[in-house]
Amino acid sequence: EEYLLIDFADTSQYLSAQNFTDNVINVAMPSTYRFLEKVIDEIGRMYQDAGVELPAFHVGGDEVPEGIWEGSAICRTFMKEHGLTKIRDLKDYFLEQILEMLDKRNIQAVGWQDIVMNPDNTVNEHFRNSKVLNYCWNTIPEQGGDEVPYKLANAGYPIILCNVGNFYLDMAYCYHVEEPGLRWGGYVDEYVTFDMLPFDIYKSLRRNLKGEPVDVKTASNGKQPLTKEGCQNIKGLSGQIWSETIRSFEQIEYFLFPKVFGLAERAWNAQPSWALSSDNKIYMDAKRKYNAGIVNYELPRLAKRGINFRISPPGIIVRDGLLLA
């Protein structure tokens, strides 16, 4: 019972995004916090033994389903003892404890955007002055998520942009039925990663979830703009590749290359010249130059090293009743 994470008498009914009904720990139990301290300290010792610093610790915290803890008598008693009025106040309390644990150990706390957002996608002001670094992943326009990064940055929260629509590298390259990868966040190829604009995020996706073209000139209409102060809170970019559907390292290489070149390009040059111009020709010229670098230099280099990568299949187009290759 020293590291027990769940209340066996909890009758809460919920379903997570992954269709789990029991994947949330009970934050009202002292054993939960003993477990967390144990994990943090054990990982810290691994770094210490290796002679390197543990600079940051990612606490996760995303996609916590509605309905958790509602059937836990332990949680209800805990709320009364600590003056908490809403179930979601437990989440704030939990995060406070983790932040304190990490701060005492001089470790930067990192988490997904969900931990500092309210269920209605508004900013949770409770953590405005916290030191947590927030990874913004759920930025799908159709779900209203594309405004979240700038909401947080403008409110003073430091963020890392890891947009699912641009930087989730386990997404399929295209919508073809035989193309491996997930599709819930759209498709991601080497051009979608290249298109990411940290300081003009609404222009980062040129197609919607259905694969239909997006007018980038009007994509930001009515959306939260990034302020001058908010710009200072964008601390970096991150690409993710989730492995639950990947069965070999060769597959990992397939998803990484050539997608990752766009991530590297944008991390190196966060505000390319074409982003500041309304002339689409400038963008197309930059895209052609980028593609030429991949085809003429990067892919041959990977091939020499025996690294697996994806080559786009031949393309066709129907124009004026003719099939052109």
Predicted regions and their residues:
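Glycine-rich beta-strand-to-loop/alpha-helix junction loops that act as flexible
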Residues: 60-63
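Substrate-binding groove of N-acetylhexosamine-processing glycoside hydrolases
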Residues: 29-37, 41-48, 52-57, 77-324
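Aromatic- and acidic-residue-enriched carbohydrate-binding clefts of CAZyme catalytic domains
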Residues: 1-31, 67-92
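Short, active-site-adjacent cap segments at secondary-structure transitions
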Residues: 65-67, 118
